[in-house]
Design a protein with these regions (language model features):
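Short, acidic loop-to-helix structural element flanking the phosphoryl-transfer center
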Residues: 73, 77, 111-139, 146-149, ...
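Acidic, Mg2+-coordinating phosphoryl-transfer loop and its flanking beta/alpha structural elements
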Residues: 195-231
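Conserved phosphate-coupling serine/threonine residues in phosphotransfer and NTP-handling enzymes
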Residues: 24, 141-143
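Short acidic capping loops at alpha-helix termini that bridge into adjacent secondary structure
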Residues: 13, 159-163, 190-194
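Active-site neighborhood of HAD-like aspartate-dependent phosphohydrolases
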Residues: 2-60
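Conserved Lys-Pro-Asp/Glu-containing loop-to-beta segment of HAD-superfamily phosphomonoesterases
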Residues: 174-200
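Conserved small/polar residues in nucleotide/adenosyl-binding loops
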Residues: 239-243
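A metal-dependent, Asp-based hydrolase signature
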Residues: 52-108, 124-129
Length: 243
């Protein structure tokens, strides 16, 4: 077991660390903003007037992306359902609304492309350091498992990770079952596992699963976006996370 030090906080008897992907290891702001804008435009082309409300729901305002907004933290299925709800408000039936939303997300995905965004500065070094210390490491993301696997492959992270877990069907964050399943897959107890993420959902999930601790990351110095964290850092201070 290892002691993890992050800023002035120490976590003792740690066996594993789970990382979120978007906004934690991956600087995905530009990708997510472009994706949300494309989805909104495609749906607005079919249902005029719905584009702007959808952008607001996604957490997009011009060039600003809210890291706590829907497109930043929700799973693919949650995003489809949220978009469909806005469509259904116009009087369309639920299944028609869901079909329009799913098609828009699929086509927007193809338009924007699946190439992962760059790693945040310091992310690779942290993974390397913690791996050398003998810790089990994994990604636990609200993105699909395929997106997680593509991210790991493109950035050549497989040597450092023992788990690549996304959300395909079933529960999403902040349901603690995701954290518990990840710990089970790694063969570690939740009480010996840290969660590193950039959303309240990450913190709630880990706390409800009785994790050893929660490390919150914020792009813009908004500690309320990671409420519940034991310690808060920003991406450029990633090097503060050491075994």
């Amino acid at each position: 077991m290892v002691t993890i030090k992050c800023k002035d906080v120490a976590f003792s008897n740690i066996e594993a660390v789970l990382f979120d992907k978007n906004g934690t290891l991956e600087d995905s702001e530009s990708y997510l903003r472009t994706l949300g804008q494309k989805i909104s435009r495609m749906i607005d082309a079919q249902i005029p007037g719905i584009g702007e409300p959808l952008l607001m729901a996604f957490g997009i305002n011009g060039d600003f992306l809210d890291p706590a907004g829907l497109i930043s933290v929700a799973s693919r299925r949650e995003t489809e359902i949220a978009a469909a709800a806005y469509i259904a408000e116009t009087g369309r039936g639920w299944f028609e609304s869901l079909k329009i939303a799913c098609q828009a997300l699929e086509e927007a995905d193809q338009y924007v492309g699946k190439t992962p965004s760059p790693l945040f500065m310091g992310s690779l070094e942290v993974l390397q350091s913690l791996s050398v210390a003998g810790l089990k490491l994994g990604i636990l993301s609200a993105a699909t498992t395929q997106e997680v696997q593509t991210f790991v492959r493109i950035h050549q992270l497989s040597d450092y990770l023992q788990l690549e877990k996304g959300v395909d069907d079933g529960p999403s964050k902040p349901d603690p079952i995701l954290f518990l399943e990840a710990c089970q897959a790694l063969g570690v107890a939740p009480g010996a596992t840290l969660m590193v993420g950039d959303s309240v959902g990450d913190m709630q999930m880990a706390r409800n699963a009785k994790a050893a601790g929660c490390i919150g990351i914020t792009w813009i110095g908004r500690a309320d976006n990671v409420q519940g964290a034991d310690v808060v850092i920003n991406p450029v201070s990633y090097t503060h996370l050491r075994a």
